[in-house]
UniProtKB/Swiss-Prot annotation:
This is Interleukin-24. Glycans are attached at N76. It comes from Rattus norvegicus. One of its GO terms (cellular component) is extracellular space. Disulfide bonds join C36-C83.
Amino acid sequence: MQTSLRQQILPGLSLILLVLNQVPELQGQEFRFGPCQVTGVVLPELWEAFWTVKNTVKTQDELTSVRLLKPQVLQNVSDAESCYLAHSLLKFYLNTVFKNYHSKIVKFKVLKSFSTLANNFLVIMSKLQPSKDNAMLPISDSARRRFLLYHRTFKQLDIEVALAKAFGEVDILLAWMQNFYQL
């Protein structure tokens, strides 16, 4: 009788999972960075993970006179330019900030939230596919200049100060990304 019951329930559960997987609201919403779209990321989860980590890390960021994500970097970014800029910033955060901050996060015991944030940044970045078309060259150059402004400021700081500052500004990055988030 148990085998018969399992055989009846299993197809029903499979169907329910299949249907739930097709409902966009349950998968996460969508980022639309100009021509680049990313689905399956739930922005509130990113915010929650960030605040969990930042509440611990914030005490480390004592340099309030410098801002890495300046208005010149993030304001008035065209939709087309947003794909390139988001890709560059997320790649930098993953390869530089998160990579070098990992050991501190382990000490602070917020690895789960940090991993949620890093893994979602990786998913978003890997799905962003900026066009390599020559017609897009002026747009990609503009995004590159914005990123270099950020990167130069980062490089001018002591590495530990720069890492704390960059991590402390993830909320600025998330707020900017939220402008491209579709429900």
